[in-house]
């Protein structure tokens, strides 16, 4: 944490940890089912306790840490350089704003259009780590061909819809992949 604060040039931060309760399990009961419980790092509990006790990390209830990061970044988006998400998780690139990958020591500025493109790319390709399959036979290269030329959310949605067995499957995947921008947010198809 000290290194991240130094590298990002700030002393102000909010840290979030994912708790046990997560709405995504209600949306998709197989969410993260492919992760073995005993495959978690042996010192994870001690690390989380350290972050809570020494760095004032907040443990989420009902959502993931990613969602609280998305809410904070969105709330501060009107102020230039007011917020930055420090994470190695590519899923967070669906949130507009500044991002810092503290392992690669890399800054990324994600525009609203970049965030939309990243979300729909994830929708097509799925997220193996979370057990979300995506559209059958669609990988990163095919997804870029499918999404080429899309500008509006409606265009992205329509482009993706053709590659799912039904609209309900697309909606279920999208609701699991979508990172909140406000409290108790939910993804809905564009209308």
Stretches with model-predicted labels:
Residues 1-50:
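Domain-level signal for Mg2+-assisted phosphodiester chemistry and nucleotide/NA-binding surfaces
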Residues 10, 34-190:
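Extended two-metal-dependent nuclease catalytic cores across DNA- and RNA-processing enzymes
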């Amino acid at each position: 944490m000290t290194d991240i604060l130094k590298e990002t040039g700030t002393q102000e931060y909010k840290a979030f940890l994912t708790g046990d309760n997560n709405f995504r399990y209600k949306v998709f009961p197989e969410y993260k089912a492919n992760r073995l419980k005993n495959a978690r790092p042996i010192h994870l509990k001690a690390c989380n306790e350290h972050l809570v006790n020494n760095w004032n990390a907040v443990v989420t209830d009902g959502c993931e840490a990613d969602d609280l990061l998305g809410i904070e970044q969105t709330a501060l988006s009107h102020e230039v350089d007011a917020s930055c998400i420090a994470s190695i998780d590519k899923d967070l690139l669906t949130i507009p704003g500044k991002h810092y990958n503290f392992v690669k020591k890399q800054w990324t500025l994600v525009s609203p259009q970049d965030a939309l493109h990243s979300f729909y790319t994830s929708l097509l390709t799925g997220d193996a780590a979370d057990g979300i399959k995506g559209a059958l036979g669609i990988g990163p290269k095919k997804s870029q061909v499918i999404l080429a030329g899309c500008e509006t959310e409606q265009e992205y949605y329509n482009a993706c819809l053709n590659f799912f067995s039904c609209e309900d499957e697309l909606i279920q995947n999208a609701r699991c992949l979508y990172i909140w921008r406000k409290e108790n947010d939910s993804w809905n198809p564009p209308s």
